[in-house]
Amino acid sequence: MEEVMISPVEHDPQGQVKQQQAAGVGILLQIMMLVLSFVLGHVLRRHRFHYLPEASGSLLIGLIVGILANISDTETSIRTWFNFHEEFFFLFLLPPIIFQSGFSLQPKPFFSNFGAIVTFAIIGTFVASVVTGGLVYLGGSMYLMYKLPFVECLMFGALISATDPVTVLSIFQDVGTDVNLYALVFGESVLNDAMAISLYRTMSLVNRQSSSGEHFFMVVIRFFETFAGSMSAGVGVGFTSALLFKYAGLDTENLQNLECCLFVLFPYFSYMLAEGVGLSGIVSILFTGIVMKRYTFSNLSEASQSFVSSFFHLISSLAETFTFIYMGFDIAMEQHSWSHVGFILFSILFIGVARAVNVFGCAYLVNLFRQENQKIPMKHQKALWYSGLRGAMAFALALQSLHDLPEGHGQIIFTATTTIVVVTVLLIGGSTGKMLEALEVVGDDLDDSMSEGFEESDHQYVPPPFSIGASSDEDTSSSGSRFKMKLKEFHKTTTSFTALDKNFLTPFFTTNSGDGDGDGE
């Protein structure tokens, strides 16, 4: 006779009540930490206290609550609501963050630096991964640190090369800086995540199969295939949505709810489509965001445009803040391997060296193909090197390594990664403002005379055909607003887009004639 399984919840009503209570307490604590993080972030912004950025504050809140939960011996049923699950991160938290990055992107600064961005993100990340892995293996061979197998060192190099400069970019916007530097840091970080994931998964496959070196040669080819396929999927979904909203006639007052619902579903469809066929959802949803903002957005009614802009900004802010809280709490709750402190210390040193090889080497390569007045200046290279924070992506991959690596090696890598994340987010994130001042790349916070000098310095690097000082609208009180105005001015005047967009794409995919700027702003 077939045995009928009865779940504990059905068998024990009292247990069901306790589980519901634990869920309520866990979710309540999460909401309280979110509220506290947003209030703290508002206070920090209002008082212009850049030594503790919002992301750092959220991480600290998670760490403190996690430590208190450990000390107070919180019930396991409540703790389970705070365990960082990489599947939850990749499927629910990451997509809105990446889509908002593409949706809010000013495309012309991004695409005018696209060659440099791809160089840093693909070649640079590959170089940084190999250099980090090689140095870690060499350090182990010289008995300076715990020795890991070579492939596992490369896995560590791949996951720790995933940058997450959310903190740096927020400070860039607050204090104001060069639009090209902002585009380089932003673009490199987004595409770098896809490269790091691809490298990590490939090395994990090599480690499981313990096979020949042919897989190492296939890493680059596989990434290019993944990148091209993911970009094509994202662009295809974006163009499909543009045609749908152009010809479906949804921009009427009684269909705004349907219009907004469909618009919100397309990004997630793009992400899941790419992940479902073995491509990169990150790259796919990024380009979906770029295409939907430029072509689909203008096909919406004004009310729907206002709603979807606010909605994606809201969801992205919630996901971003929750990720850092989630990560901080889990760091405090997880078991760590502190018996190999040397591995942690040397890893911090090695990723700094690898980041330098990545940035300065790729910048040299990019400058070889640029005119003298368009070369990346050294102060921008230094800022780019300093902006290589590690965050949620590296943490999620390190958490995955606990399952991928046996014999406690994953625990060592996880402990080293969490330490690096905390150190870079708190120390580097908190000192970014001073770094920008020291490198003299601060823009809108300076006085008028220095601002004019900054405008002149822009002509040393992809000279923008605009003059910030010539505007009569500089009475705005917020430096962040002035920075956004500068981005918008750059977006409207630069000539990086070809006539193809104006004469063919915009008229075909939108209700616009293509005679305007087509910003969709």
Swiss-Prot record:
Keyword Coiled coil: no
Primary localisation category: membrane
Induction (UniProt): Induced by NaCl in a ABA-independent manner.
Domain of life of the source: Eukaryota
GO cellular component: endosome; endosome membrane; Golgi cisterna membrane
Protein name: Sodium/hydrogen exchanger 5
Role, per record: Involved in trafficking to the vacuole. Required for cell proliferation and cell expansion, but not for cell differentiation. Acts in low affinity electroneutral exchange of protons for cations such as Na(+) or K(+) across membranes. May also exchange Li(+) and Cs(+) with a lower affinity.
NCBIfam families found in the cross-reference section: b_cpa1
Biological-process GO terms, alphabetical: potassium ion transport; regulation of pH
Molecular function, one GO term: sodium:proton antiporter activity
Region (Disordered): 453-480
Lumenal side: 45-48, 137-141, 187-222, 293-310, 362-382, 433-521
Membrane topology according to the record: Multi-pass membrane protein
One Pfam family per UniProt: Na_H_Exchanger
Record: glycosylation sites: N299
Key words of the record: Antiport, Endosome, Glycoprotein, Golgi apparatus, Ion transport, Membrane, Potassium, Potassium transport, Sodium, Sodium transport, Transmembrane, Transmembrane helix, Transport
Catalysed conversion reaction: Na(+)(in) + H(+)(out) = Na(+)(out) + H(+)(in); K(+)(in) + H(+)(out) = K(+)(out) + H(+)(in)
Localization in the cell: Endosome membrane; Golgi apparatus, trans-Golgi network membrane; Golgi apparatus, Golgi stack membrane
